[in-house]
Amino acid sequence: MASIVASKRIPLFRLVEQLLAASPAQGAASALRPVAVAGGSRAYNTGAQLRRHERDESDDDSGRGYDTRRPTRDATMPAFFSDVFRDPFSAPQSLGRLLSLMDDLATPAGRAGAATLRRGWNAKESEEALHLRVDMPGLGKEHVKVWAEQNSLVIKGEGEKEAGEDEGAAPARYSGRIELAPEVYRMDQIKAEMKNGVLKVVVPKVKEEQRRDVFQVNVE
């Protein structure tokens, strides 16, 4: 073989191709790894999250490629839902979106999805006012601030570090900003009450006949 390479000066990769072509069919077939096919025997959940995984070639091929495990957070719930009053750097949320979430939870599917997720706040709107409730366990009224600025309702709360806690432990913090239309709500008449770790905020609404952005049209 060495004499052939020396005499004909065949490149190494050409020689490898010739050797592979001359191998028995059964030997070539044995060198091929079987491909696992995800057939109909695997039951898929339509509500499960489908994620693509890149694995090393040394991994087992069985069930390779996709992970159908259900994510820890229910897929029907928005990511910001449980943290709307927890993330100090969260972007302002529109009132319409918050109320839409409450409507979704009122449906059977929404109640089922919220069963595994503790809701720490509630929002509802009546003809007279907007009512908000925020759970802030461990906090008193001296730890909470509520104010209105730039057409937004801002709620912030920060607890105190208790004696005996780890130095790296941070006190409980709550923060939220909700955009409100000034022509609909009386931003200068907001009322807030903190009692037993629960903050209740009431934002009065402008009466229909007093709204400047509503114009009645006569029907002829």
From Swiss-Prot:
Q: Name one Pfam family in it.
A: HSP20
Which stretches does the entry tag as region Disordered?
A: 46-73
Looking at the record's lineage, which domain of life comes first?
Eukaryota
What's the family? Belongs to the small heat shock protein (HSP20) family.
Q: Where primarily located? A: mitochondrion
Q: What is this protein called?
A: 24.1 kDa heat shock protein, mitochondrial
What are the BP-aspect GO terms?
response to heat; response to osmotic stress
* PANTHER family in the cross-refs: 23.5 KDA HEAT SHOCK PROTEIN, MITOCHONDRIAL, SMALL HEAT SHOCK PROTEIN HSPF
In which tissues or organs does this protein occur?
Expressed in roots, stems, leaves, spikelets and embryos.
Q: Where is the transit peptide?
A: 1-21
What cellular component GO annotations does this protein have? mitochondrion
